[in-house]
Amino acid sequence: MKHFLTLRDFSKEEILSLVNHASELKKEPKKLLQDKTLAMIFEKNSTRTRMAFELAITELGGKALFLSSNDLQLSRGEPVKDTARVIGAMVDFIMMRVNKHENLLEFARYSKAPVINALSELYHPTQVLGDLLTIKEWNKIQNGIAKVAFIGDSNNMCNSWLIAAAILGFEFSIAIPKNYEINPEIWDFAMKQALISGAKISLSHDKFKALKDKDVVITDTWVSMGEENEKERKIKEFEEFMIDEKAMSVANEDAILLHCLPAYRGYEVSEEIFEKHADVIFEEARNRLYVVKALLCFLDNQRGRK
């Protein structure tokens, strides 16, 4: 049985197939998961993730069950593996938005239903699928290659995009502050994948260097959930990494900006640049619905083969 915990577990062909199927489902909705059930476990609050998953399973003909931390005996000390065994035996899919990736891995180890990573501190793979669909729609993949820059924190979005770019053979540049680094194990994996795919990946501390000649610019919030006590320090460390008019002028003339939201204007992106690219950004958010539909169908098909 296949889970969706990180894009590392998926081939180039599988990733592109998910994006293409999402595009088809966007054009022609189908009830492909009649009477299937999705359990949604949230340790972290969400707007877009809950909307995307709940609507996806509903529009596919299934049902969603929302479970917060307070709804589960996990909050009272029940082992993760026991909760996984119970929920996994009752539903068809489990979506988890968690604080610790290790809990996600343990849940998947014991669940009889496929587990989907809807966000952990290490990865945010469903968001990257939505980004890829958006890039496809804006014709930013030419001859199988997209030229992408990620500017900001070396967080779960950066990790997931690094992996995707390495597998897909993209040109991908990262710019982060000097006292930040990419997870070494994830970086090593990406470098090995790049040798296979032909991806061109670079890392610097200069946003202008990373942005040069890029068609897609990606940024994210500097202060993730749970880091509120670090806000003042991080804002100071990241102040040179805002995406503003000067920054976008270094990218290609028709470059698009992506942001997984929520966006904090005046910090990671200027108000002017955000509004200039708002149509793309909010379509990016909407596209989460369609990639989740494709993902659920994929996992259902994989499970049916066993």
Swiss-Prot record:
Keywords: Arginine metabolism, Cytoplasm, Transferase. Belongs to the aspartate/ornithine carbamoyltransferase superfamily. OTCase family. It comes from Campylobacter jejuni subsp. doylei (strain ATCC BAA-1458 / RM4099 / 269.97). It is found in: Cytoplasm. Reversibly catalyzes the transfer of the carbamoyl group from carbamoyl phosphate (CP) to the N(epsilon) atom of ornithine (ORN) to produce L-citrulline. Its main location: cytoplasm. This is Ornithine carbamoyltransferase. Its EC number is 2.1.3.3. It catalyses: carbamoyl phosphate + L-ornithine = L-citrulline + phosphate + H(+). The keyword Cytoplasm applies. It comes from the Bacteria. GO terms for molecular function: amino acid binding; ornithine carbamoyltransferase activity. GO terms for biological process: arginine biosynthetic process via ornithine; arginine catabolic process to ornithine; citrulline biosynthetic process. Carbamoyl phosphate binds at S46, T47, R48, T49, Q73, R97, H124, P125, T126, Q127, C260, L261, R288. It is an enzyme of class 2 (transferase). The lineage of its organism: Bacteria, Pseudomonadati, Campylobacterota, Epsilonproteobacteria, Campylobacterales. Pathway: Amino-acid degradation; L-arginine degradation via ADI pathway; carbamoyl phosphate from L-arginine: step 2/2. GO terms for cellular component: cytoplasm. HAMAP family: OTCase. Coiled coil: none annotated. The keyword Cytoplasm applies. L-ornithine binds at N156, D220, S224, M225.
